[in-house]
Amino acid sequence: MKSRKNILISLICMIGISFVLLSGCSNQKEPIVKSDHYQTKTPLTMVGFVDEASKKELKIHNEKEERFTYLLNKTKINNCDHLTKGDHVKIRYVENKIKNKKGKAIEIWLINPTEIVDQAQAILNGMSLEEKVGQMFFVRTPIGSGASDAAKYQLGGYILFDRDVRPYDKVGLSNQLQTYQNNSKIKMLIGIDEEGGTVNRLSRYLAYRGAPFLSPQALFAQGGMDLILSDVKEKAELLNSLGINVNLAPVSDVSINPNDFINARAFGKDADQTADYIGKVVNAMNENHIGSVLKHFPGYGNNVDTHTGIAYDKRPYDNFLANDFKPFEAGFNARAQAVLVAHNIVDCMDPNFPASLSKNVHDILRNTLHFRGVIMTDDLDMEAIKDFIGTSSPAVFAIKAGNDLVMCSDYANQIPSVLAAIQNNEISEQQINESVHRILTWKLNINIIQGGN
């Protein structure tokens, strides 16, 4: 009798243990595997590096060394004919739903081919710290010392304003810009704001074009997207002929209210229509070999002009997710490689710092929107920043926040401040290397420099 009782107790214990084990397994989350094992439960959006690519499947790993397999039976590959090991890619399921992804098509965007990444690293390895920091400054062209300052500071680039183009004709300006390039070990970004409409640094002068370029809204009203894309091509041809390789455009802000400060410069449609416009314009700029800069992240909305003071944005974060971020995401997906961050203070993201100086805002760009290109400040000489920074170094603030490129005039003082911050361990040299690698990658992608520099 006692033996039967013991057997019964043993059976009950075994059943109980089995139940606990089975219950635990059913509720246990699948662990993240950091090995050669590839998970088939794939995230909705992924940025990573190709390990293997075939017609049937794609194996990739992300920056955390997590590995995933994507089935390619329904795949749309944008901007690349094939993928090879080491390519930097972004993958997204077409339908924005996490569950029931079986059979859903995915889209793949090539961020950077592995050979571009390797070429940028090779150039970076041969640079001094001073040269690296110089590359992080995209500055107003100095009057009278453009060539000598290019040689002295090895600047990342010059931005042209009215005063820089007005004295010349096409041949004269082209020759002047070439003198800057001749004094740079690493060829410079030469940028200009040629948005069309109210902002035309170049075409406002008859020496460069018979009439100023029209605004996106005016072009769309006259001829739809076909006329806009024709305009993009003409701008690119003009800028390239002069030696200008970056147009600080397109304006990616969502504005449907004519009274908004930014409205006349924006597309003037809702978020989805603006996103469609931005994607097509960036694609056209890439096809015509001109660098694009999406601006002004995270979106001006109905804010005031930060050229004259700090703007405070009280809109909820959901508003940005549903509207303002969409055009920027469309631009990133079309392989825009630079984004300009505005000076407005966006309360829901960071109530204490302007967006351009906010680590929170830059984290959103990197971790929420998965942007891997160049982040640059708006002009640090604007009143919005002067009001906030006081006598401190705006460049140090900007780089600590996560900016790769600093836009300013006072580079002769700002560059030594950044070098001092590195020596004092305020800024790590690893961060500098990562930023300069992105800048070099951008220059390689738009053919400013080649692998051998």
Residue positions per predicted region:
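Preference for extracellular/luminal or secreted protein segments
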Residues: E115-D149, T368, F388-N453
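Phosphate/pyrophosphate-binding betaalpha-module
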Residues: Y277-V293, N323-A336
